[in-house]
C-alpha cells in the first residue's frame, strides 16, 4: 500500500494544530496564581528579604510558574538580575559536579579546575553579571528545591556573603514539591542548621492550584482574546470553533458549566484542594479539540464536553493523589 506522506492542507491539519500556542510546551499564561506569586516576590525584592520558599503538590504548575515569574521580573524590574536554576543534585555525584553544572547554566565557558577553582569562578561570575547589569539585587529562582542538599544551602550562604561584600543582595526564591521539600527542611533542623533555614527558608508559602472562580474566568478569557498568528490571525478559541464563535460562543462564559462538570467528575474535596494546572490544561485542550471535530463533522455541540474532557484529564485521580500526599504530610507533623 502506498502512503501519501504530504500533510493535509486544511486550516486545522495535524501539523498546524501541533504548532498552535495552545499545544506548545513553551506556552506559559499569566494566570491568577502566577500573578499572586509575582506580587509576593516583588514585595520580597522591595523589602530586601534574603529568601523564601514556595511549595506545591505535583502537577500544580511549579516549573511553568517560575518561567513566567522570570519573564515578569525581567520585564517589570529590569534592574534586577534574574538567574534561573534547576536543582537535580540527586544525579550530581559531587559538589564539584554541582559547580560545573551551575557554571554551564549561567553560560560560563570554562568548566576546568578543582572544586575551589570552580567555586571561586562561579561566585565571581555572579558578581560580574550583577555589575554588568548594574543591579543591586540578584534574584535566584531555584526549581525542584525538594532535591536540595545541605551542601547546596551552604553554597548559597557563601554566594550571599561574597555578593554582600560587593554591595549586592542575593535573594533566593525556591520552588519545591510537597511533602518532599518539608523533608529537606526537617533534615536541616535535625542537623542544627537553623541559620540556613533562617536565611533562605523561614518564609514558606504555598503556590496554589486553580480554585477560585476568577482563576478560571481569567484563564478562559485569555483563550478568548489571544491571537494567533499575531498579525491577521484568529483568537485561540475562534481557531478551533469558528462557527460557534460567530454565534457568540466565548470560553469565559463557560466557567459555570465547567465548575458544574468539576463537581460531577471529581471528589467533593476538589474545590478545596484546587485543580492542578496540568489536568486543567489537558482538559481545555481536549475540550477545544472535541468541539472542533464535532463542528467539522457537522455534529451537534457537545453539551457534556467538559465532563468528557475532565474525565480524559483524570482529574479525580490527580486530586486523590494530592489528598494522599497531604495525609502523608500531616502524619509527619
Where are these regions (language model features)?
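The catalytic "switch" region of P-loop NTPases
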Residues: 82-91, 138, 162-254
Amino acid at each position: 500500500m502506498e502512503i501519501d506522506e504530504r500533510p493535509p492542507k486544511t486550516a486545522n491539519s495535524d501539523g498546524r494544530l501541533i504548532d498552535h500556542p495552545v499545544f506548545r510546551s513553551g506556552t506559559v499564561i499569566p494566570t491568577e496564581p502566577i500573578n499572586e506569586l509575582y506580587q509576593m516576590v516583588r514585595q520580597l525584592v522591595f523589602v530586601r528579604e534574603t529568601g523564601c520558599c514556595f511549595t506545591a503538590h505535583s502537577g500544580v504548575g511549579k516549573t511553568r510558574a517560575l518561567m513566567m515569574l522570570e519573564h515578569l521580573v525581567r520585564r517589570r524590574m529590569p534592574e534586577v538580575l534574574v538567574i534561573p536554576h534547576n536543582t537535580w543534585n540527586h544525579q550530581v555525584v559531587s559538589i564539584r559536579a554541582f559547580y560545573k553544572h551551575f557554571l554551564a547554566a549561567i553560560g560560563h565557558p570554562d568548566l576546568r579546575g578543582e572544586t575551589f577553582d570552580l567555586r571561586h569562578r562561579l561566585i565571581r561570575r555572579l558578581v560580574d553579571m550583577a555589575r554588568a547589569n548594574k543591579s543591586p539585587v540578584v534574584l535566584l529562582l531555584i526549581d525542584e528545591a525538594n532535591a536540595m542538599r545541605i551542601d547546596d544551602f551552604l553554597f548559597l550562604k557563601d554566594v550571599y556573603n561574597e555578593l554582600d561584600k560587593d554591595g549586592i543582595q542575593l535573594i533566593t526564591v525556591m520552588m519545591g514539591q510537597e511533602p518532599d521539600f518539608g523533608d529537606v527542611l526537617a533534615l536541616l533542623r535535625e542537623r542544627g542548621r537553623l541559620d540556613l533555614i533562617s536565611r533562605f527558608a523561614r518564609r514558606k508559602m504555598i503556590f496554589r492550584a486553580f480554585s477560585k472562580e476568577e482563576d478560571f474566568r481569567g484563564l478562559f478569557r485569555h483563550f478568548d482574546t489571544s491571537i494567533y498568528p499575531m498579525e491577521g490571525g484568529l483568537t485561540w478559541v475562534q481557531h478551533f470553533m469558528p462557527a460557534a464563535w460567530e454565534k457568540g460562543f466565548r470560553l469565559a462564559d463557560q466557567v459555570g458549566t465547567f465548575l458544574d462538570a468539576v463537581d460531577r467528575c471529581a471528589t467533593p474535596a476538589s474545590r478545596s484542594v484546587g485543580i492542578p494546572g496540568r489536568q486543567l490544561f489537558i482538559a481545555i485542550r481536549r475540550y477545544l479539540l472535541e468541539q472542533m471535530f464535532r463542528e467539522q463533522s457537522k455534529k451537534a455541540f457537545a453539551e457534556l464536553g467538559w465532563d468528557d474532557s475532565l474525565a480524559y484529564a483524570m482529574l479525580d485521580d490527580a486530586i486523590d493523589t494530592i489528598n494522599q500526599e497531604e495525609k502523608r504530610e500531616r502524619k509527619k507533623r
